[in-house]
Amino acid sequence: MNLVVLNGRLTRDPELKFGQSGKAYSRFSIAVDRPFQSSSDKNSQTADFINCVAFGKTAEFIGEYFRKGRKILLNGRLQMSQYESEGKKITTYVVIADSVEFGEAKTSSGTTETSSYGRSESKSTNNTIETPGFDENSSDDMGAPTEIDDEFPF
């Protein structure tokens, strides 16, 4: 299973562009804190900078509502690409964002507030957007039979 979950801050404003087919895509980078132990300070932190891309409605949502420094929660998958440059094989990795959420809520004064877990304090349920293909109205049983037989087949 290829699943990536990130919680970080945008390092720059997202770039919202449209492909030849008219489909939106957005490129952005997230700084994600990571604790590590150094010889001088046992509880140090550093940040990993992770390149991301989103498509369709998710890209439009990011382009409209997110800016540099804004906290973002992201679910997606890791994608590897390879190409040659000056005779050298280059490998790059990017996270494809399938869904995103606000990592903090804006208050009426324009400041942001987060809980101790970095989750939004907002009671709004409309702060998540997912890529097309997921039907929120479908049942969550994934097509499983409704009756369970207690007999084992072996």
Curated annotation (Swiss-Prot):
TM stretches of this protein: none
Low complexity bias locations: 107-119
UniProt keyword annotation of DNA-binding present: yes
Keyword field: DNA-binding
Domain of life: Bacteria
Region (Disordered): 105-154
Pfam families: SSB
GO BP terms, alphabetized: DNA replication
InterPro entries: NA-bd_OB-fold, Primosome_PriB/ssb, ssDNA-bd
PROSITE patterns recorded: SSB (PS50935)
GO cellular component: nucleoid
GO molecular function: enzyme activator activity; single-stranded DNA binding
Sequence ranges assigned to domain SSB in this UniProt record: 1-104
Subunit structure: Homotetramer.
HAMAP family with a match to the protein in the record: SSB
Protein name: Single-stranded DNA-binding protein
